[in-house]
UniProtKB/Swiss-Prot annotation:
Organism: Chlorobium luteolum (strain DSM 273 / BCRC 81028 / 2530) (Pelodictyon luteolum)
Residues at which Mg(2+) binds: 175, 218
Domain comment, as recorded: The Walker A ATP-binding motif also binds Pi and PPi.
Entry EC no(s): 2.7.11.-, 2.7.4.-
Cofactor: Mg(2+)
Subunit structure: Homohexamer.
GO molecular function: ATP binding; magnesium ion binding; phosphorelay sensor kinase activity; protein serine/threonine kinase activity; protein serine/threonine/tyrosine kinase activity
Pfam families linked to this entry: Hpr_kinase_C, Hpr_kinase_N
Keywords assigned: ATP-binding, Kinase, Magnesium, Metal-binding, Multifunctional enzyme, Nucleotide-binding, Serine/threonine-protein kinase, Transferase
Spans annotated as Important for the catalytic mechanism of both phosphorylation and dephosphorylation: 217-226
Enzyme kind, highest EC tier: transferase
Protein name from the UniProt record: HPr kinase/phosphorylase
HAMAP family: HPr_kinase (MF_01249)
């Protein structure tokens, strides 16, 4: 099985989408300073720019496609100029197709500069946040928007706080297992279509649902189940980090399966290696409980560096090498 498909990436986001959504995910409130067509302006990069040199007249390397931040330094510079000089300096911004301008620390633009931005179709916003915090929050939001992502067939469940991705051929019962885990008190992130993102250069993968399918599940023989309506808000999760992948396999008596758990397998998703557990399916096997144990084993290894197979192996080695014991003692 391979999940290392080439990641997709947004080319741009509209300024309208940015304005309408950043406040939902981050502690930053933007207020409009003018009225222009926000749908027409697009943001192409996650990085921001403070246009101090551009305002001073040096525009050779002006990264105008980035969102522009005007903080205390930039606004004070403009304010200390005469009216004509101020207009000339601000024209170094408005003659480019800048996505939008954000004024931090509740700074203001002179009315004539605001009119210039409006005439150029540049949205202008203001926030009470400092430049440092605003840059951090806006960059984090855009990092999410421009992150690598891919859609996978499977189910994503939060088991004891561990994000477990269930994969395998269609018809093996991934949705039924996910539903059983929800009934046992765990949380459903997504079923059937799982959207996985890798943020920036981090080694973290986050999984979320497809917005159309939402938290609905299709159970063969039963039909569509609304997990949120049936089990309540405690049964769903919006986003969860992918920490373990469980691949469900059809039972094959000719195949050799892992028995001790000493060999750690991994699978690559969007360039990140994730622990992999392969579970054969056959009648009478309680997969739900086994997946709970998979999650608990992961927590034991992460926080206590404890692996049951290694502990048992060490114990047997100590007994075998103990000269004071007899072969009979070993079997007792």
């Amino acid at each position: 099985m391979t999940l290392d498909q080439k990641g997709l990436k947004k080319r741009s986001v509209t300024v309208a989408y940015f304005f309408n959504n950043i406040g939902k995910k981050h502690d930053i409130r933007l207020r409009r300073m003018n009225t222009v067509d926000e749908q027409e302006r697009r943001i192409f990069e996650r990085d921001l720019h403070r246009p101090g040199l551009a305002l001073a007249g040096f525009t050779n390397l002006f990264t105008y496609k980035r969102l522009q931040i005007l903080g205390n330094t930039e606004t004070r510079f403009l304010n200390h100029l005469g009216e004509e000089e101020r207009k000339a300096a601000f024209a170094n911004l408005t003659r480019f197709k800048v996505p939008c301008i954000i004024l931090t620390s509740n700074n203001k633009l002179q009315p004539e500069l605001l009119d210039m931005a409006t005439a150029a179709g540049i949205p202008v916003y203001v926030t009470r946040q400092s430049s440092t915090k605003a840059i951090y929050l806006v960059t984090d939001f855009l990092d999410d928007q421009f992150s690598l992502y891919q859609q996978y067939h499977g189910s994503m469940v939060d088991v004891y706080g561990v994000g477990v991705l269930l994969t395998g051929k269609s018809g093996l019962g991934k949705s039924e297992i996910a539903l059983d885990l929800v009934e046992r008190g765990h949380g459903l992130v997504a079923d059937d279509v799982v959207v996985i993102r890798r943020k920036g250069e981090t080694m973290q993968l986050s999984a979320s649902r497809n917005n159309i399918i939402d938290h609905f599940m299709e159970i063969r023989g039963l039909g569509v189940v609304d997990v949120k309506a049936n089990f309540g808000i405690r049964a769903i999760r919006d986003v969860k980090e992918v920490l373990v992948v469980v691949e469900l396999l059809e039972w094959n008596k000719e195949m050799e399966y892992e028995r001790l758990g000493l060999d750690t397998k991994t699978i690559r998703i969007l360039g990140v290696d994730v622990p992999l557990v392969q579970l054969p399916i056959f009648p009478g096997k309680n997969i739900t409980v086994i997946i709970e144990v998979v999650a608990l084993n992961f927590l034991l290894k992460r926080y206590s560096n404890y692996v049951a197979a290694e502990a048992l192996t060490d114990r047997i080695k100590k007994v075998i090498h103990n000269d004071d014991r007899t072969a009979g003692d070993i079997l007792v």
